[in-house]
């Protein structure tokens, strides 16, 4: 009799609409219960039985129950699952399989089966890619996943690389394809094969994409020709190779090996500016005045060159610093190195006075054995030879940015707008508390930003600099010319790495159109979206492989008294993140390791400080001594402890 009763339906509807609900993200804990985090201030308790319906990271709508002053959440509807496609380790045998996601907060095995057509007999310990198929909040009985790809077996030494690439859905090898002959682009190539061009790279580099030639001019001026490898002489726009490069967007540099954007035959041979081999190039000729200013007679042209020497960073630096036993092979090469060092000096001073110069951070290099084991991690400081190449490339990119802006009005530009305008007042207020007075309007201009950066660089420590970093906007890739506040430049467009960056290949094609006096089509904005996304994924992959290798490298130091100098990079409620100075590893120091009495300890992310009994004991950028307390291989995390 109550079956289709409209009153009853109305009552149900009323009850439903009156029941309080909240949308938020599920946060799991080690203890079985969880929380529904609605925002930074508000969260609701989720009891263990209800946690079985959800997974850490799920965005859900939950019914809020109140009993005896205590509120709890009952998951009701799935808004967005945390897991869709993921990597994990297989448990069990072929008839009954489960997969444990490779994620620090997901410990439960999810029942699964292999997808149809996947011809691999899965066994315990295998790594696989899986996709979620069932979720309790979608009306399914339980969680269920389907294995869609076999990655590798559990004991494979190269697990860090294969699992990371699969996780981010990135290619594992070089693209297929060959380029048999150069295209007829209708370009006249200047013959510069007689000039003493040199390349300066790491000893192991095969994909040399830049060669340099310098010449002294009257009136204390210097001429610099930057010659860049010319892959677009082989790869036609819209061709199969071009499309593959467009998807990859960059060469992916991981510790130990790289996955090139172009086939190796092109990147490491046909396009690579090898010593004593004639190669086509796109070149830029510029004149530098005595104070390092780039004069207006910038010239882009196509050419052929023959590099006369493959020089190595450390050897060149040693020679310029009068150490080591390496000597340039001829006086002509020695003269090139001397002139290039002079150009570097002038350009460095010009940028210091008129733009911005980054503080030098060492690069960390993993030295790996045959089986992927980490033999050592070495800090490679940026020396004079690195700076020679860097200054030449920055100068060449400034030239390209100007030419593309003035002749076409578009290109692939690296744009960085400095501070987010919404943060300007908060930034000025923060700086004021530290005795620096800035105008909130002025700091949003390029000049105002540069002025502030120079003041910050003159501070005795980097503490204040670290505090304001959160107010900065991110660098972007844009087809529209715009300033790059981080470099202190009005415009910046890279074209000096076309073997490893697709955006540089696009700029090559645009520069060639300018050289030929032709009209060019503006690049589509979606290509900048693809490039930004690939850059993000490649960086995450590099970080993930690095974390794995750091954990392997430091595992035997856990629980020992070995001391490491460590810079504090971040402070949060739970403790401090530090970077080990000698090798670049990131470690976490939990708050209880800082002080035993929790009530006397204040870890403030906002202030970047740790206070004990009201006294500031640690702050971001401090360098302290730590020991390694524990290395958790399953989460690749390193736990450190300050040396008392």
Curated annotation (Swiss-Prot):
Gene from which the chain derives: rnb
Protein name: Exoribonuclease 2
Residues covered by the RNB domain: 189-516
Catalyzed reaction equations: Exonucleolytic cleavage in the 3'- to 5'-direction to yield nucleoside 5'-phosphates
Organism: Shigella dysenteriae serotype 1 (strain Sd197)
A GO CC term assigned to this protein in UniProt: cytosol
GO terms of molecular function: exoribonuclease II activity; RNA binding
Record keywords: Cytoplasm, Exonuclease, Hydrolase, Nuclease, RNA-binding
SMART domains named in the record: CSP, RNB
